[in-house]
Amino acid sequence: MYVVQCMSGKEADVQNEIFSQGYMARVPAAVRIERCGGKWLDRLRVLMPGYVFVDSPMHDDLYHSVKGVDGVIRWLNPGRPESLCEDEITFIRRLTANNEPVPPVDIETKPHLKIHSGPLAGLEHTIVEFRRRQHRIRMRVTVLGEEHTVFLSANFRETPSERH
């Protein structure tokens, strides 16, 4: 799996164009719970704006056809694109399973941090911060050795000791 940098907001267009050329492309997205006008709304948000993940073996045709797509800025590690490591590939595939956005995760914070559902179950070690009031968690993601921060929506579960 390789990474293409594209213009922010053009991720879906770039993904569709890469699909139309016969290659697999992934854009991690999530349903984010946001407050707007006093109401909580579900909105679709790209998790890593400006990046499209190309899930195909690298060869000259792929390199040149993707580079020519409108909205593509460059391959990461230009000249000789570098593949993601296996852990990074697994994580991106979990985020983009069935080309569906990541739903809000069910999470319990006491006595220990625990993700109960969704593609992120078992990845508690990547959570950096949780914000109950905003219904959000912040996760650490590594892509080609660089750390990125991703925000996901969360439904916080109460434990029996928290109820009064």
Where are these regions (language model features)?
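Short, charged beta-turn/beta-strand-edge "cap" motif at the junction between a beta-strand
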Residues: 117-121
